[in-house]
Amino acid sequence: MKVLRKNHPLLKIVNHSFIDLPTPSNISSWWNFGSLLGTCLVIQILTGLFLAMHYTSDTTTAFSSVAHICRDVNYGWLIRYLHANGASMFFICLFIHVGRGIYYGSYILSETWNIGIILFLTTMATAFVGYVLPWGQMSFWGATVITNLLSAIPYIGNTLVEWIWGGFSVDKATLTRFFAFHFILPFIITALALVHLLFLHETGSNNPSGLNSDSDKIPFHPYYTTKDLLGIFLLLLVLMILALFFPDVLGDPDNFTPANPLNTPAHIKPEWYFLFAYAILRSIPNKLGGVLALILSILILAAFPLLNTSKQHGLIFRPVTQVIYWIFIANLLVLTWIGGQPVEYPFTMIGQIASITYFTIIIILMPVSNTIENNIIKL
């Protein structure tokens, strides 16, 4: 068996990636989230496949087809709620994975980091088009509001919006194409994830100390396969608790009402995992400015490798930047809260302050703290 796994053309790739892979001996549980994201992706593809067998992407039957899945299909309610809450688990793991990357300086591996940003954007696009499919009130109005943002693009904006809609409003053509996108994008995510792994295994993993670990490596199997399995079981436990006991806690009550173009919900908002970006979008009064800020809120992650001036890897020995990092996390939570609030005082003002703080921390405070710490080391 040993000879086979080391010599067989296909098994050799698996062996080098998951069995004999030299791994730092000190990586903590924060490194588990890569495998958890892979697990979430598999769960989403499998549950999504079974949902697609019963779903109809037509404006007249989409809402009732989801109701049919929950009522008449064997364990359809479970598949539907695993898929809906699986998306939330996916984003929780994604945010922690990115947060760990920032804390421990994983952005130094720039190719892996940049592919990760593309993965993040693709996952956000997949979740957005997926949210439209049940064709409830929030699905319809969320799709209308977010796609309408493209009209802020000079000259081609209105044409682009009508092209995406497939008409003069969000309608049957929009729903059909969004279903097609939602079906194909997870497979693109899978391909990108393999490229992400490929680049990671070219350089090897980072580790909590931020020091070179070439002299202290252990094989991935059995040490980290066991550790990852524990993480996967805990993830499945949390997902099952969510799906079985609190299936609608992260959803929107408006989505239990079929889409009605003549009745606008009181507060239009996306799913919870987009609220931080939505708050940044709303905090700028100008439409084009808001759209640019929304895009920059994600693309600014690409600036981390460029703005890094620290002589140390990661924040474990950098107390000043550690404080700034945790302020940044708290600020993100404030933005998430504000994104779900109505557009009125004091929420608008808090949102504007939090949005300015978000960009200030990344562009100014972190590089300045890096310089301060470099000077402290010299003393």
Curated annotation (Swiss-Prot):
Family designation: Belongs to the cytochrome b family.
Subunit structure: The cytochrome bc1 complex contains 11 subunits: 3 respiratory subunits (MT-CYB, CYC1 and UQCRFS1), 2 core proteins (UQCRC1 and UQCRC2) and 6 low-molecular weight proteins (UQCRH/QCR6, UQCRB/QCR7, UQCRQ/QCR8, UQCR10/QCR9, UQCR11/QCR10 and a cleavage product of UQCRFS1). This cytochrome bc1 complex then forms a dimer.
The protein's required cofactors: heme b
Functional description taken from the UniProt entry: Component of the ubiquinol-cytochrome c reductase complex (complex III or cytochrome b-c1 complex) that is part of the mitochondrial respiratory chain. The b-c1 complex mediates electron transfer from ubiquinol to cytochrome c. Contributes to the generation of a proton gradient across the mitochondrial membrane that is then used for ATP synthesis.
Localization of this protein: Mitochondrion inner membrane
GO biological process terms on file: mitochondrial electron transport, ubiquinol to cytochrome c
Residues where a ubiquinone binds: 201
Segments traversing the membrane: 33-53, 77-98, 113-133, 178-198, 226-246, 288-308, 320-340, 347-367
Organism phylogeny: Eukaryota, Metazoa, Chordata, Craniata, Vertebrata
InterPro entries in the cross-refs: Cyt_b/b6_C, Cyt_b/b6_C_sf, Cyt_b/b6_N, Cytb/b6-like_sf, Cytochrome_b, Cytochrome_b_C_euk/bac, Cytochrome_b_N_euk/bac, Di-haem_cyt_TM
Protein name: Cytochrome b
Other remarks in the entry: Heme 1 (or BL or b562) is low-potential and absorbs at about 562 nm, and heme 2 (or BH or b566) is high-potential and absorbs at about 566 nm.
Positions with a binding annotation for heme b b566: 97, 196
Gene name of the record: MT-CYB
Cofactor note: Binds 2 heme b groups non-covalently.
Source organism (scientific name): Akodon juninensis (Junin grass mouse)
Broad class of where this protein is predominantly found: mitochondrion
GO cellular component, one term: mitochondrial inner membrane
Binding site for heme b b562: 83, 182
Membrane topology note: Multi-pass membrane protein
Keyword field contains Heme: yes
GO molecular function annotation: metal ion binding; ubiquinol-cytochrome-c reductase activity
Top-level division of the source organism's lineage: Eukaryota
Keywords for the protein's UniProt record, in alphabetical order: Electron transport, Heme, Iron, Membrane, Metal-binding, Mitochondrion, Mitochondrion inner membrane, Respiratory chain, Transmembrane, Transmembrane helix, Transport, Ubiquinone
